């Protein structure tokens, strides 16, 4: 019987996962209880004047990319639709991969597109924290187009690459 020679890895990776979970919970609790305003915007703590609208209202840092997309479209309804789509795409994304291979390491062009997308989201986040003025408006519009084009181009490149491999 070959079971005698096998090493049971179940306790090891289970213990590793439990330790990792405990460390992450500890870090989260430490952040929330010790310094809850660390990632907040200092402008949120300025007492409001109800007679004056603030010059720049901005959301939390994790929605700044969507805020930049909202501001980059001049039409109000179009901006709101783009804002909702920019977040809804992220929820649909796990069901979006229809490629033959389940890793991006087999698609070199998609690797380049991934890094372009990462830079695009970082720049959109930065632009979301800037005031609404030139050149940020034009740059936000260009990056918004790149953001949505990624979701159109990425599956086409994957299918093209799958056809090349056949």
Swiss-Prot record:
Bilayer-spanning residue ranges: 15-35, 77-97, 109-129, 136-156
Cofactor note: Binds 2 heme groups non-covalently.
Keywords assigned: Electron transport, Heme, Iron, Membrane, Metal-binding, Mitochondrion, Mitochondrion inner membrane, Respiratory chain, Transmembrane, Transmembrane helix, Transport, Ubiquinone
Disulfide linkage: none
Record-linked SUPFAM superfamilies: a domain/subunit of cytochrome bc1 complex (Ubiquinol-cytochrome c reductase)
Lineage top rank: taxon: Eukaryota
Membrane topology value: Multi-pass membrane protein
Entry's Gene Ontology cellular component terms: mitochondrial inner membrane
GO biological process per UniProt: mitochondrial electron transport, ubiquinol to cytochrome c
Compartments, as annotated in UniProt: Mitochondrion inner membrane
Keyword Acyltransferase carried by entry: no
A single MF term (Gene Ontology): metal ion binding
The keyword GTP-binding is assigned to this record: no
Cofactor field: heme
Family: Belongs to the cytochrome b family.
Other comments on record: Heme 1 (or BL or b562) is low-potential and absorbs at about 562 nm, and heme 2 (or BH or b566) is high-potential and absorbs at about 566 nm.
Role, per record: Component of the ubiquinol-cytochrome c reductase complex (complex III or cytochrome b-c1 complex) that is part of the mitochondrial respiratory chain. The b-c1 complex mediates electron transfer from ubiquinol to cytochrome c. Contributes to the generation of a proton gradient across the mitochondrial membrane that is then used for ATP synthesis.
Subunit and interaction comment: The main subunits of complex b-c1 are: cytochrome b, cytochrome c1 and the Rieske protein.
Official protein name in the record: Cytochrome b
Source organism of the structure: Drosophila subobscura
Gene: mt:Cyt-b
């Amino acid at each position: 019987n070959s079971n005698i020679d096998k090493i049971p890895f179940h306790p090891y990776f289970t213990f590793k996962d439990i330790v990792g979970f405990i460390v992450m919970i500890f870090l989260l609790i430490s952040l929330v209880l010790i310094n809850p305003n660390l990632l907040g915007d200092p402008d949120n703590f300025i007492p409001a004047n109800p007679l004056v609208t603030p010059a720049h209202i901005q959301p939390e840092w994790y929605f700044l990319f969507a805020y930049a997309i909202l501001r980059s479209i001049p039409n109000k309804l179009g901006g709101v639709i783009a804002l909702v789509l920019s977040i809804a795409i992220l929820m649909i994304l796990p069901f979006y991969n229809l490629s033959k291979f389940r890793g991006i390491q087999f698609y070199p062009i998609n690797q380049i597109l991934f890094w372009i997308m990462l830079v695009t989201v970082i720049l959109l986040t930065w632009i979301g924290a800037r005031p609404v003025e030139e050149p940020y408006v034009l740059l936000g519009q260009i990056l918004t187009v790149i953001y949505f084009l990624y979701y159109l181009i990425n599956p086409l490149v994957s299918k093209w690459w799958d056809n090349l491999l056949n």
